[in-house]
Amino acid sequence: MVIEQSIYSSSQSTGTAQANLELPLSSPLHLSGRINTKALFSPDNQSQSGGFEFEIGVDEVGRGPLYGSVVVAAAILPKAWSGETEVGLLQDTPLAILTDSKKLTERKREKLFEPVKQHALAYLVVEVPAGVIDEINILQATILGMRVACEQLMVEITKVWRDASELPTAPSTPLGFKLLIDGNKVPDLDEARLATHGICLADMTVTQPAGMVKFCAEAWVKGDARHNAIAAASVLAKVYRDRQLIADGARYPGYGLEGHKGYPTKAHVEAIARLGVLPEHRRSFKPVQQAIEGTLAGTHYS
């Protein structure tokens, strides 16, 4: 099952990033991903209790650049492969070299990209463009991307789970999710929207309707180096964005986007001063603001 979607409103899929956010968004979020329905609900991925509890690793890339989107990815690995990195569950698998994408060379990340997509039970990549970053700020844009990734992947999997015609197991088999978020904070999800799809936060203090799909969420500091599912998401996000910047480097010669990937290097800032601001530059970031105001000359950032 392939996922391809564009979202023009932050409430269309996730609820507002913050209470005073104006809707709709001026630029669309783009979602792309895949669910391997046969593998996802195979007996190999059932828990000892007979149900399914999927660990969804979530990571982002691109908060610091002056140019382009921030990209968030979410990934579910097979149960036998999903766990803390130090346990060594990926040894002798096609993902044996998987770790935090920042510790991998570009060549190794590229080598892992297709195998991660091929062997993941499900994955989703969310692209939050520069226009949205300028509209709601980079922090809220990152949170929004994480919300979309978490919610939409849970919703799509729950839809498949409820469709008995696509499953090798009965749809009454319990289903749950554990969200593993790279960083020190779990984004607030739109629980009202999730409830309309029969998904709720696991809470032992509240009586919940029977048959609800439950989820919990954890923040993992440096999680991309600590958990295989987060590391897989990290590689997907990094390679997706890098490929985008390499393509844009060919579209916009002279800016060096294919090299610095949009980050505020001296060469990038000098190129902006010399060649001008591109549509995908983040106008809310200081060096870009200075270029627009004509005050960038002689100033560089590293």
Curated annotation (Swiss-Prot):
Predominant cellular place of this UniProt entry's protein: cytoplasm
Gene Ontology biological process terms, A to Z: DNA replication, removal of RNA primer; mismatch repair
Against CDD domains, the record matches this protein to:
RNase_HII_bacteria_HII_like
Checking InterPro entries in the record gives: RNase_HII, RNase_HII/HIII, RNase_HII/HIII_dom, RNaseH-like_sf, RNaseH_sf
Q: Which family does it belong to?
A: Belongs to the RNase HII family.
* Coiled-coil blocks: none
A Pfam family this chain is assigned to: RNase_HII
Fetch the Gene3D superfamilies from UniProt: Ribonuclease H-like superfamily/Ribonuclease H
The compartments listed are: Cytoplasm
Keyword Manganese listed? The answer is yes
The chemistry this enzyme catalyses reads:
Endonucleolytic cleavage to 5'-phosphomonoester
Alphabetized, the UniProt keywords read: Cytoplasm, Endonuclease, Hydrolase, Manganese, Metal-binding, Nuclease
Manner of cofactor binding, per the entry note: Manganese or magnesium. Binds 1 divalent metal ion per monomer in the absence of substrate. May bind a second metal ion after substrate binding.
- EC category name: hydrolase
Provenance organism:
Psychrobacter sp. (strain PRwf-1)
Q: Where does a divalent metal cation bind?
A: 59-60, 163
A single cellular component GO annotation: ribonuclease H2 complex
Q: What does this protein do?
A: Endonuclease that specifically degrades the RNA of RNA-DNA hybrids.
Mind listing the GO molecular function terms for this protein?
manganese ion binding; RNA binding; RNA-DNA hybrid ribonuclease activity
- List, for all copies, the residue spans of the domain called RNase H type-2: 53-297
For this protein, what is the EC number?
3.1.26.4
Q: Which cofactor does it need?
A: Mn(2+); Mg(2+)
Q: What is this protein called?
A: Ribonuclease HII
Q: Which domain of life is it from?
A: Bacteria
